[in-house]
A protein has these predicted regions:
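Membrane-interface helix caps and helix-loop-helix hairpins in membrane proteins
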Residues: 112-121
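A structural-propensity feature for long, helix-poor, extended segments
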Residues: 151-183
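Individual transmembrane alpha-helix segments
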Residues: 29-61
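Interfacial/capping segments of alpha-helical transmembrane domains
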Residues: 1-23, 177-180
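Hydrophobic cores of alpha-helical transmembrane segments in multi-pass inner/ER membrane proteins
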Residues: 53-62, 131-137, 201-214
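Membrane-water interface at loop-to-transmembrane-helix junctions
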Residues: 79-100
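Short aromatic-rich membrane-water interface segments that cap or initiate transmembrane helices
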Residues: 22, 36-44, 188-203
Length: 225
């Protein structure tokens, strides 16, 4: 049977969480212990999760791609079909989007940048930014959204973020994670520029999550990207 909830002798109450709680702030520099755990102690696991998002999106993009060898007519026909589902100049929705999208994006950036100081981080902040992009798309359509965010943009942004994350933590592969300290100092706990590499990793995760969330919505909406 399952162990009783909250019991002091539960198997999970061992030296591992005790190490996180007692030494997490000193070793990671992150006031938010959860962020210190997933982006420092378990950074490789988080890197794998980010790669799963990117690979899943790329796989769907490949499956839904249009073969250019079939001619330009099929591409033009698909683009025409996409425009059928464009919003019909909904004044109310566009007005609301003009008001809400900027603070939504700013709040998402705030959640990412302050993930090591309190609740938040790359996953939640990226989801907020992705929601803002989806709202903008629903209000103004593909024609305006694709001026600054296309499938190619997503691929390069995600590839760059994942490459930066991998390079930032790759030294552990060669050291075996044996108490090697980051070249970036931990700083003063509670300051925005603290916790060493965690702030950079949060930004990388946020970019991947925001792009993946928006791209999946686009693919569900028009059957490709």
């Amino acid at each position: 049977h399952l162990p009783p909830f909250g019991a002091a002798d539960n198997p999970v109450n061992n030296e591992v969480p005790r190490r996180y709680i007692e030494n997490g702030l000193q070793e990671t520099g992150a006031v938010n212990i959860v962020t210190g755990m997933i982006l420092d102690y378990r950074a490789f696991d988080t890197l794998g999760e980010s790669h799963v998002l990117f690979i899943a999106t790329c796989t769907v993009l490949i499956l839904l791609r249009i073969d250019k060898k079939k001619g330009k007519d099929s591409i033009a026909e698909r683009e025409a079909n996409d425009r059928i589902y464009e919003p019909k100049n909904d004044v109310i929705l566009q007005t609301v989007a003009r008001i809400l999208v900027p603070p939504i994006i700013i709040f998402g950036i705030y959640v990412i940048l302050c993930g090591h100081l309190g609740p938040g981080g790359g996953f939640s902040g990226g989801a907020v930014i992705g929601a803002g992009l989806i709202l903008y798309l629903n209000a103004f359509g593909f024609a305006k959204t694709e001026r600054f965010f296309t499938a190619k943009t997503y691929k390069w942004m995600s590839f760059g973020a994942l490459a930066c994350y991998a390079l930032a933590k790759s030294y552990s592969f060669y050291t075996g994670a044996n108490e090697i300290h980051s070249v970036i100092p931990l700083g003063t706990p509670g300051a925005i520029l603290s916790s060493g590499l965690i702030l950079i990793l949060n930004i990388c995760v946020g970019i991947v999550v925001a792009g993946t969330m928006y791209t999946f919505y686009v693919m569900f909406r028009k059957g490709g990207y």
